[in-house]
């Protein structure tokens, strides 16, 4: 593999480990309130113990101690490596917290001295990464290298070569430069310039970059949704966490499922965001199978582990629910048919009696208060006897009288007493103890209750209207049936439009019978008187409506004599 290829692979591996560190800083909080990382990966500290840091070793130790306590995942492993003229592994890779505590004690006892051979420290880290990969773990690795000086040209070449070798094994490399460092050299040793943390204010400022390292290097898996799936069905899983877009190339991010600690299946996610991944999951055919969720940031070269487990369970299909809904729908349809069928089939005509008119004693028909009318002494009109002997008063507008009655002309000496008030208002009702009923305060739900009451009245009115139309027991009727009858002969247009279907048919036209045969008249036995000549003018016919039709004559009309 060429140098560029090894560099790219190593950078991807280091990115994965660094992202895990960032997740630790973002994913949770420690008991003391500081940021923490729950990512599961291998963390290597490569520390410069050359003579230039002789008087600043305590600052370096406290920096490592504080940073180590931020990674609290039980699946995280840690190693301490120091370098000067040669590299030394103070503590091998371990997840045992007691051994980590002892390793920190050994680190505190280190006496700095010697030259700055950074490549020696990278060699010790690459050896452990290679050994762990050969064991089949393939865990993501993060390397944090700290130095305070500028490397000579040949030492820089060796350091860059060993850093590329670590990247080829799947590690992500971060560099911390203190005071007199060469930032260009550290940018080439680390994955990129963004993976370099400069501390220009000296060793006492190391505590200020702990949060930045956690934020940039931690990738953690917090949860999976759903965590329980149906056996034998395909599904998609949403991986919740932090730092998923911290990879150098998001196209190389993979979701990994380790099934029953034996088979590992990798799937490319549909969506990659900083706080979640949307991944297709493999089909788990048996009930009780478990799949441990992992994430790879370098196309499967190494993986960030987690404690998130996806389990399978037995699920029933939705056919039972569909059948139940279908039965419920059929029952509802039958109920509606039973209710509305008599309305469509049985025709019952009833005359609904008019509603009784309630006479209000307090108000008129138009809803206005009862009007007070003038009191007239009817004795002057002749009421109660001749001449109005007995006194009688009449209030206009009461007991059959109308307002127009008040406009009648009164007698000259009639006495009229006008009321003090024109309208008579109803008095408020009192309780049994002669106390008025207090008005109830308006509640917050009064508008809602009013609208619901109005809706209920509307529904009730519609129900009563339909209920009245339904036939009662004992009612008889006939089902409506529409039949279309085809006529073989087309209808003829009437000859005379003056006759309608409601008038009787016209009378047939009368035809007189043929005249009788001509016979000679017999000889006259006596002279006949002369026939008077008809008058020149005829009297007008009587003014009477013409008959509808004339009856036919019983005999032929006489012929005029010559």
Curated annotation (Swiss-Prot):
Compositional bias segments (type: Basic and acidic residues): 400-420
Modification type Phosphoserine: residues: 360
Glycosylation positions in this chain: 164, 182, 260
UniProt modification remark: Glycosylated.
Short name of any one Pfam family annotated for the protein: Ant_C
Superkingdom of the source species: Eukaryota
Disulfide bonds: 37-218
Keywords, comma-separated and alphabetical: Cell membrane, Cell projection, Disulfide bond, Glycoprotein, Membrane, Metal-binding, Phosphoprotein, Receptor, Signal, Transmembrane, Transmembrane helix
Stretches of the chain found on the membrane's Cytoplasmic side: 341-562
Annotated family: Belongs to the ATR family.
Subunit-structure text: Interacts with gelatin and type 1 collagen. Interacts with the actin cytoskeleton.
Protein name according to UniProt: Anthrax toxin receptor 1
Source species of the chain: Rattus norvegicus (Rat)
